[in-house]
Structure formats: structure tokens, C-alpha cells
Amino acid sequence: NFIIMRVISGIYKRRRFDVPRSFKARPTTDFAKENLFNVLSNNYFDFEDGVTALDLFAGTGSISIELVSRGCDRVISVEKDPQHLAFISQVMREVKTDKCFPIRAEVFRFIEKCSEQFDFIFADPPYALKDLKSIPTRIFESGILKEDGLLVLEHGKENHFEEDPHFIERRAYGSVNFSFFRATVPATEQ
């Protein structure tokens, strides 16, 4: 018994992958993912322009494969569940890419130890994660987001980040919410 994970756009457009229903992680819905990437492509990135990305709490790798499909230069997928990580690795082998690097790690430890910087960081923690509110602060304090980079945090509607000094916008698609953050917020967006 499976859940279908689809690639929305790019070189792997329309590719489908069967995610076992036994997985705790669920792929971001097609509706939310398509809208998120429309916003990213129209307002923030040309993913084919050497973009490096970090996918935290990567789950099924739905965002990672979408980033690779759209032309990201390098994607690191961080996931602590060994089954989920094996699934991400299998998907990347199936599409024969060398652009994605799945890493088994606890996300907060990874953030502390990582010395690389990224143009784009996506985090999709479990909505009930007790430290969810601390994620933007941890990322900005660690220095892993480039100065002109973008952080997108997926969360439930009960979480609000508007008071965060790095917050720039929030998008909601059904029950899925995305908050956007930048290291340096332009004066027009404050």
C-alpha cells in the first residue's frame, strides 16, 4: 500500500515514486509543493543558476527531488530515520543524479556542526516538534544560510513567526503553511 510522490516540474517532471504507507513522514502535498515552487521560481530563485540547497527533516525526499529536477547544483538531504533515508537514496539512484547527498543525522546536531553555507534551506519538521519555533534562530545563529539566502519553514497553521526579525512572508495552502525568512530583510519588507 503506497502514497504517490510526484515530481512537479523540471527534468524529472511527472516521475512518480511509491512511498510506503508505513512511513511516518508524508510527502508535502502536490498542491502545496507546486504553489511553493511557483513562489520560489517567480520571486526568489532561478534554480539553474548554481543554487545550493539544504533539505532538513527531508522525510521522503519530495522537496529534494524537486530541487534536483529544477536544476539545483547541490542538495543535501538531512533525515534521521534510516528507512526514510534509504528511500531518498533509492529515488536518487533511480533518477541517476549525483546532485543530491542524503545524510543520516539529527537535524539540530547537523545545524550546529555544518560548515557549509547554502542559498536555500527548506525545513519540514514534524508539526508537533516541541522545538519547531527555534528552527529559524538556530539556522541564523549557525551561519549556514548565505547572507542573501532564503529559509522556508513548513508548519501547521497554529505556528506564527511574524515577530521573528528575519521573517518576510507566510503562504498557506490548505493545512500546509510556509514561512519565509532572510538573513537580511530589505527595509520595504520589514
Give, region by region, the residue ranges found by the protein language model.
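Class I S-adenosyl-L-methionine-dependent methyltransferase catalytic core
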Residues: 1-190
